[in-house]
Curated annotation (Swiss-Prot):
One of its GO terms (cellular component) is CCAAT-binding factor complex. Its main location: nucleus. One of its GO terms (molecular function) is protein heterodimerization activity. Induction: Enhanced by dehydration stress. This is Nuclear transcription factor Y subunit B-6. Gene3D superfamilies: Histone, subunit A. Expressed in roots, flowers and developing siliques. Present in etiolated seedlings. The lineage of its organism: Eukaryota, Viridiplantae, Streptophyta, Embryophyta, Tracheophyta. Disruption phenotype: Altered response to abscisic acid (ABA). Heterotrimeric transcription factor composed of three components, NF-YA, NF-YB and NF-YC. NF-YB and NF-YC must interact and dimerize for NF-YA association and DNA binding. Interacts with PRN1. Binds directly with DPB3-1.
């Protein structure tokens, strides 16, 4: 399929009834080729470049597959194998989940006329979309992270959150809930075992209530145990 512009002009020149010397016609066509933009002279290269660009954009929609595989292998025994289709399925699920939560958090920011999505926006979006069971454990991790990063000055006398051997949360009714030591930073990992497994965490004792309301009905005395990266033994 021919492009417009100079191609149409060349047809009129070649089909002209007035004869022209062969040398003059050849020189004219060569000059015409030099006048065209480089992309017209190399259509195949342009087409391939466009396909590569589309491919890159498609890949940018997903979390890198190497990261997905690394996360999957943390929970699997050493001898386990992962098929390619399962890797791609998890990759698409994780990427879709990130987009789902981020989009909801972004809508909240737009309503409040803010440009920066905060961790609180993400937790709010997760709660609104029905992922309530993740809120309280992730909130604890967030407090731990911020304290160790020095972003918040937390003291025991202030009352809201304090750190001793673990993370202690004071609830509105005055009860205290202690969460076990989280290990060194930056190695804040999710639990790697399925012992009383709930949403990536391992609980001993009563499982904590994950609602954002702060109720202590199910959370009193619960401990979140975070293990280093280890392998299962079947």
């Amino acid at each position: 399929m021919e492009r417009g512009g100079f191609h149409g002009y060349r047809k009129l020149s070649v089909n002209n009834t007035t004869p022209s010397p062969p040398g003059l016609a050849a020189n004219f066509l060569m000059a015409e080729g030099s006048m065209r933009p480089p992309e017209f002279n190399q259509p195949n290269k342009t087409s391939n470049g466009g396909e590569e660009e589309c491919t890159v954009r498609e890949q940018d929609r997903f979390m890198p597959i190497a990261n997905v595989i690394r996360i999957m292998r943390r929970i699997l025994p050493a001898h386990a194998k992962i098929s390619d289709d399962s890797k791609e399925t998890i990759q698409e699920c994780v990427s879709e989940y990130i987009s789902f939560i981020t989009g909801e958090a972004n809508e909240r920011c737009q309503r409040e006329q803010r440009k920066t999505i905060t961790a609180e926006d993400v937790l709010w979006a997760m709660s609104k979309l029905g992922f309530d069971d993740y809120i309280e454990p992730l909130t604890l991790y967030l407090h731990r992270y911020r304290e160790l990063e020095g972003e918040r000055g937390v003291s025991c006398s202030a009352g809201s959150v304090s750190m001793t051997n673990g993370l202690v949360v004071k609830r509105p009714n005055g009860t205290m809930t202690e969460y076990g030591a989280y290990g060194p930073v930056p190695g804040i990992h999710m639990a790697q075992y399925h012992y009383r497994h709930q949403n990536g965490f391992v609980f001993s004792g009563n499982e904590p209530n994950s609602k954002m309301s702060g109720s202590s009905s199910g959370a009193s005395g619960a401990r979140v145990e975070v293990f280093p990266t280890q392998q299962h033994k079947y």
